[in-house]
């Protein structure tokens, strides 16, 4: 099993010369995409909705939209917490798993972050046929 590497994706923004890191891998979470999405929905309500809204629409002065056309822009918004570009779902995952939730950054398991992101991707119209993992996240190009 490959070693889970989250932080190097974030460092790419600081140094274009570094090689791409290995993708995060789940450690035994949901075995079906339906179960992963259901788990992600509940985790989203519990951990994310206060700042990102009950439908992912964003909350002014708390958190940006995570569902809809304004979700996950390639470049950071002015005054955003993030300072990295989002080209793939793996980029979003790497940043989110280090910086979210805002009141307890990095406090969830890899499987929990993947579940939330699987829920969020499907809410944005991305079709997932199997549970989201690192290789699948790297293959989802948000901004070519």
Where are the language model's segments positioned?
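Flexible coil segments in periplasmic/lumen-exposed cytochrome c-class electron-transfer proteins
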Residues: 103-144
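Gly/Gly-Pro-rich "capping" loops immediately C-terminal to redox-active cysteine motifs
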Residues: 56-92
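C-terminal motif of bacterial Sec signal peptides marking the signal peptidase cleavage site
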Residues: 11-13
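An amphipathic alpha-helix signature
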Residues: 86-97, 110, 114-118
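Electrostatic cytochrome c docking/interface patches
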Residues: 18-43, 59, 104
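Sequence/structural segment immediately N-terminal to covalent heme-attachment motifs in c-type
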Residues: 34-59, 63, 67-69
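Sec-dependent signal peptide recognition
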Residues: 1-7
């Amino acid at each position: 099993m490959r070693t889970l590497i989250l932080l190097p994706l974030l460092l790419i923004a600081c140094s274009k010369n570094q090689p791409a890191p290995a993708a995060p891998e789940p450690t035994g979470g949901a075995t079906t995409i339906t179960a992963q999405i259901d788990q992600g929905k509940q985790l989203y309500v519990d951990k994310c909705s206060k700042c990102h809204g009950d439908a992912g629409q964003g909350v002014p002065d708390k958190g940006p939209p995570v569902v809809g056309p304004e979700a996950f822009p390639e470049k950071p918004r002015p005054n955003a917490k993030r300072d990295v570009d989002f080209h793939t779902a793996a980029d979003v995952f790497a940043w989110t798993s280090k910086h979210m939730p805002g009141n307890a950054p990095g406090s969830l398991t890899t499987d929990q972050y993947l579940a939330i992101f699987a829920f969020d991707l499907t809410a944005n119209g991305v079709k997932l046929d199997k549970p989201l993992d690192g290789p699948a996240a790297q293959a989802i190009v948000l901004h070519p």
